Regions:
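Conserved helix/coil segment N-terminal to the catalytic DExD/H
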Residues: 1-26, 37-42
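Structural recognition of the conserved hydrophobic beta-strand(s) that form the central parallel beta-sheet
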Residues: 3-6, 50-57, 196-199
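SF2 helicase motor core recognition
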Residues: 12-14, 88, 197-212, 232-236
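Conserved helicase ATPase core of P-loop NTP-dependent helicases/translocases
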Residues: 15, 153-154, 164-203
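Conserved RecA-like ASCE P-loop NTPase motor core of nucleic-acid helicases/translocases
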Residues: 140-148, 169
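Conserved segment of the helicase C-terminal RecA-like domain
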Residues: 223-229, 233-254
Length: 254
């Protein structure tokens, strides 16, 4: 007997109180790098299972929380990105760092105003880079990560006017809208199929699109965790996908 639940649901008092503390023999926690959050602590502190397994691709946190301590520093298995790629568990990636664009004498970077980040000039700059480095993909399927929701929406509109098929998907959208957007990206047959989903961070984790073949970073991040999460969206192996193309417009490679 198995129960699948989100932490947000399980942490609710009316749900958690339905279970005895020793109700579960095994507890498996996905995305356990979030376990420093109060909702995770509440659930993990409540249950007294015989065995608890935490899984994450990014165990390190930037807020000082020690996830390893929650498991008494017992590591069942550990494999890093490079080792996973060498073992052919993940697909290879081709990485292209694109130099900053200068608009009206100003260099577009992470501190730039949204009007520059979503300008026609920068949108064309992004489109030209996509055209240049997409020569190997017969059918483009990509995620574009932006800094803000407004930027994601405006950039999507700009890229659509330049001939790409994109859709901005944000936390404001329902689960049904997000699922439909993913299906449109995956499909080869739908007349409304998409080439790119543009978002801020809702696709950093928790999605599975094996045939994704492009990751486009139009946002900066000082977090190695977020960088690896976003890169990891494209590293699932799939038939006919020898590698994923990563195009970085904001110098994350520094």
């Amino acid at each position: 007997n198995f129960i699948f639940a989100s932490i947000s649901t399980l942490a609710r008092e009316d749900v958690l109180s339905q279970f005895a503390r020793d109700h579960f023999d095994y507890i498996i926690v996905d995305e356990v790098h979030r376990a420093g959050a109060e909702s995770y602590k509440k659930v993990l502190d409540y249950f007294n299972s015989k065995f608890t397994l935490g899984m994450t691709a990014t165990p390190e946190r930037t807020d000082g929380q020690d996830i390893y301590r929650l498991f008494d520093y017992n590591i069942a298995y550990n494999i890093r990105l490079q080792a996973a790629m060498e073992a052919k568990l993940l697909c290879q990636f081709h990485y292209y760092g694109i130099s900053d664009l200068t608009i009206d004498g100003l260099s577009v970077d992470d501190s730039s105003d949204t009007r520059f980040l979503t300008s026609i000039a920068r949108s064309r700059h992004i489109k030209e880079a996509i055209d240049t480095y997409s020569m190997h993909e017969k059918r483009k399927r990509g995620l574009i990560f932006c800094r803000t929701v407004d930027e994601a929406k405006e950039l999507s509109e700009r890229l659509n006017t330049l001939g790409l098929r994109t859709l901005a998907v944000t936390g404001e959208d329902s689960e049904a809208v997000r699922e439909d957007a993913i299906q449109r990206l995956q499909s080869d047959r739908r007349p409304d199929m998409l080439e790119y989903l543009v978002s801020v961070d809702i696709f950093n984790e928790g999605i599975d699109i094996p045939n994704l073949n492009q990751i486009i970073m139009a946002r900066p991040t000082q977090s190695a965790i977020i960088f690896v999460q976003q890169l990891g969206r494209g590293l699932r192996k799939a038939k006919g996908k020898p590698f994923v193309t990563v195009i970085d417009f904001v110098g994350n490679y520094d």
